[in-house]
Amino acid sequence: MRLAVNIDHIATLRNARGEQEPDPVAAALLAERCGAAGIVCHLREDRRHIKDLDLARLREAVTTKLDLEMAMTGELQEIALKTKPELITLVPEKREELTTEGGFDVARHFAVLKEFLKPLNDNGIEVSLFIEPEKKAVDLAREAGADLVELHTGLYAQKELENNTDLELQRIREAATYAKSIGLRVVAGHGLNYRNIGPFREIPEIEEVSIGHAIIARAVFTGLDEAVREMLRLIQ
């Protein structure tokens, strides 16, 4: 299993003082040196953490894989086509939320989604949809033109706090198995941390996990290099 490191909260920390440090690009390069297989950043519509300049600099610097998380808007589509990350992940977005609260509603946006994805597909940019671990969502993601799906693990993380993860883990496992069986690649993310990541080693269909907040929080105490390496030890 591979690790993609989300560096959004390096930018959050920088923006808290309106300064230049810490630098998200420096964090991305360090994560890569420590074994991360990809770097994730979310260019939100309100630019609350990652800024346009950060994205441009990340595109120049990242040598593994750059995964741009974004909402389905014309502005961000143009930015993606110009920047050409290896992967874009479409996520739902609400201005009032602290973090992404759920999976993309593929059924609701299906007709528009197919048209939105076409120029990205045509320009060689792989597309992932951040979805709930449900068979219908997986089917629609494939039909819309996604190359892979990122299964939303937020409810699993919430259940972990309640010591009640079995049903949600089974739902994720079944969705991953089904997605793989119909030709989609599978990754997972949201709320994963050093306590709850272990069971994902037993789901071979999930090829990568995307983790940000837990790693950045651990890095405050251990340093980013050790935080990344510790997570890699847990997933490999």
UniProtKB/Swiss-Prot annotation:
It comes from Chlorobium phaeobacteroides (strain DSM 266 / SMG 266 / 2430). The record marks E150 as: Transition state stabilizer. This is Pyridoxine 5'-phosphate synthase. The active site is at H42 (proton acceptor), E69 (proton acceptor), H190 (proton donor). It catalyses: 3-amino-2-oxopropyl phosphate + 1-deoxy-D-xylulose 5-phosphate = pyridoxine 5'-phosphate + phosphate + 2 H2O + H(+). CDD domains: PNPsynthase (cd00003). Pathway: Cofactor biosynthesis; pyridoxine 5'-phosphate biosynthesis; pyridoxine 5'-phosphate from D-erythrose 4-phosphate: step 5/5. Its EC number is 2.6.99.2. Keywords: Cytoplasm, Pyridoxine biosynthesis, Transferase. Catalyzes the complicated ring closure reaction between the two acyclic compounds 1-deoxy-D-xylulose-5-phosphate (DXP) and 3-amino-2-oxopropyl phosphate (1-amino-acetone-3-phosphate or AAP) to form pyridoxine 5'-phosphate (PNP) and inorganic phosphate. 3-amino-2-oxopropyl phosphate binds at N6, R17, G191, G212, H213. GO terms for molecular function: pyridoxine 5'-phosphate synthase activity. It is found in: Cytoplasm. InterPro entries: Aldolase_TIM, PyrdxlP_synth_PdxJ, Pyridoxine-5'_phos_synth. GO terms for biological process: pyridoxine biosynthetic process. The gene is pdxJ. SUPFAM superfamilies: Pyridoxine 5'-phosphate synthase. Pfam families: PdxJ. NCBIfam families: pdxJ (TIGR00559), PRK05265.1-3 (NF003625), PRK05265.1-5 (NF003627).
